[in-house]
């Protein structure tokens, strides 16, 4: 299936059915009172996050979704039937934006999440509601309300804990294959990866994280060159970026340090927030070099990019803020286990810190509410 991560659609809810104007007409009841029923509600349009849906491709072909109108009311106090709702299944990670107001309508972040995109109109009132002591035979009823209508932009941003960043052919797809069950296409030419791939990295029965591989970036990506710029947005939800560098390119004219600096520059031009995310350096394809050559190239690379952070062999207790460096071979799995274990430790600690921060903010908010309560001179709360 073709991967589509953007689409524009129109949704329109159904109109409510009109209320009925009707009177009882039975034998021996010549002047029966009003018995017009209400109209049925119009159908609404909903979006539902579905973990089994991976792309927005169907919304490229069908662009308008119209719910049915409610039925009109009937005599004998019979209400019109309400119209069925329409439920649009969308991938988890879909951001829905109103094209007219630029308002974010919904951000579908978990399976089963359901959001109303267009609410169906209420049914009109039948004349039975307008009977009074001064008007025993009202002919008044109300029409059903119009349903809501919207033009929407759908944008899929994959949900992953870790994102892989790098030039085409840096070995990102090989890495995600080495550490997860994902099986992206791998070949010895640039732009083998044409759309994002997700892989679940399982540490043990209780710990795992999701890794995302996007098409490689090239210089000028922020201005639209290559494929990667279209998919950089998929890294915006990640908590950690891995910058994968090919330390042993087949083309001897390629300078890994210059390519790495170009990637960082493109990232900064594209989005300062994305540039500011925690980013670790992963030097790949060490299996192509002997140990001495690997160390020589690593030292030259680190000097060229101005790396002044700890190196893998340094005795250093990493903290949450310090970028980390790894030397691996994704093909032979050399160094990959240490990499995934450090990622897992980092993500676990990150979640713990975020949970503590949320609890502290909640406690502070509760204290503020209590302090704002009116008190008596003795400090006891006044009853409302």
Curated annotation (Swiss-Prot):
Main subcellular location: cytoplasm
Keyword Protein transport included in the entry's annotation: no
Binding-site list for GTP: 166-173, 191-195, 213-216, 284-287, 329-331
Cofactors named for this entry: Mg(2+)
Cited Gene3D superfamilies: GTP1/OBG domain, P-loop containing nucleotide triphosphate hydrolases
Alphabetized GO MF terms: GTP binding; GTPase activity; magnesium ion binding
Residues covered by the OBG-type G domain: 160-348
GO biological process: ribosome biogenesis
Subcellular location as annotated: Cytoplasm
The organism's place on the tree of life at top rank: Bacteria
Compositionally biased spans, kind Gly residues: 33-43
Residues binding Mg(2+), per UniProt: 173, 193
Residue segments, region Disordered: 20-46
Catalytic activity, EC: 3.6.5.-
Residues covered by the Obg domain: 1-159
Keywords recorded for this protein, A-Z: Cytoplasm, GTP-binding, Hydrolase, Magnesium, Metal-binding, Nucleotide-binding
GO cellular component: cytoplasm
Keyword 4Fe-4S on entry: no
Known role: An essential GTPase which binds GTP, GDP and possibly (p)ppGpp with moderate affinity, with high nucleotide exchange rates and a fairly low GTP hydrolysis rate. Plays a role in control of the cell cycle, stress response, ribosome biogenesis and in those bacteria that undergo differentiation, in morphogenesis control.
Record-linked NCBIfam families: Obg_CgtA, PRK12297.1, PRK12299.1
Family: Belongs to the TRAFAC class OBG-HflX-like GTPase superfamily. OBG GTPase family.
Subunit structure: Monomer.
Protein name: GTPase Obg
């Amino acid at each position: 299936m073709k991967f589509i991560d953007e689409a524009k659609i129109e949704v329109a809810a159904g109109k409510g059915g009109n209320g009925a104007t009707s009177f009882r007409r039975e034998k021996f009841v010549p002047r029966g009172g009003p018995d017009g029923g209400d109209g049925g509600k119009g159908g609404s349009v909903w979006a539902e996050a579905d973990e089994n849906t991976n792309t927005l491709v169907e919304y490229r072909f069908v662009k308008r979704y119209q719910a049915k109108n409610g039925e009109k009311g009937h005599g004998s106090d019979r209400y019109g039937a309400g119209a069925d709702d329409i439920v649009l299944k969308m991938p988890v990670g879909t951001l829905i934006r109103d094209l007219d107001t630029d308002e974010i309508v919904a951000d579908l972040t978990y399976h089963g999440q359901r959001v109303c995109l267009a609410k169906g109109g209420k049914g009109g009132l039948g004349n039975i509601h307008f009977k009074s002591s001064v008007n025993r035979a009202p002919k008044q009823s109300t029409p059903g309300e119009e349903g809501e209508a919207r033009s929407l932009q759908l944008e899929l941003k994959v949900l992953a804990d870790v994102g892989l960043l790098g030039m085409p052919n840096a070995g990102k797809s090989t890495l995600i294959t080495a550490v997860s069950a994902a099986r992206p296409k791998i070949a010895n030419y640039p732009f083998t990866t044409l759309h994002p791939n997700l892989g679940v990295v399982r540490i043990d029965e209780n710990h795992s994280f999701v890794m995302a591989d996007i098409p490689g970036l090239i210089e000028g990506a922020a201005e639209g060159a290559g494929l990667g710029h279209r998919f950089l947005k998929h890294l915006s939800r990640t908590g950690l970026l891995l910058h994968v560098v090919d330390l042993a390119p087949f083309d001897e004219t390629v300078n890994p340090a210059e390519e790495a600096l170009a990637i960082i520059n493109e990232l900064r031009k594209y989005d300062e927030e994305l540039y500011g995310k925690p980013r670790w350096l992963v030097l790949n394809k060490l299996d192509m070099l002997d140990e001495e050559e690997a160390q020589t190239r690593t030292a030259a690379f680190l000097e060229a990019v101005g790396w002044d952070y700890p190196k893998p062999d340094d005795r250093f207790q990493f903290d949450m803020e310090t970028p980390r460096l790894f030397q691996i071979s994704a093909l032979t799995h050399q160094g990959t286990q240490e990499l995934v274990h450090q990622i897992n430790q980092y993500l676990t600690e990150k979640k713990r810190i975020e949970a503590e921060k949320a609890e502290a903010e909640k406690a502070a908010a509760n204290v503020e509410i209590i302090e704002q309560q009116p008190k008596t001179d003795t400090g006891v709360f006044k009853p409302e």
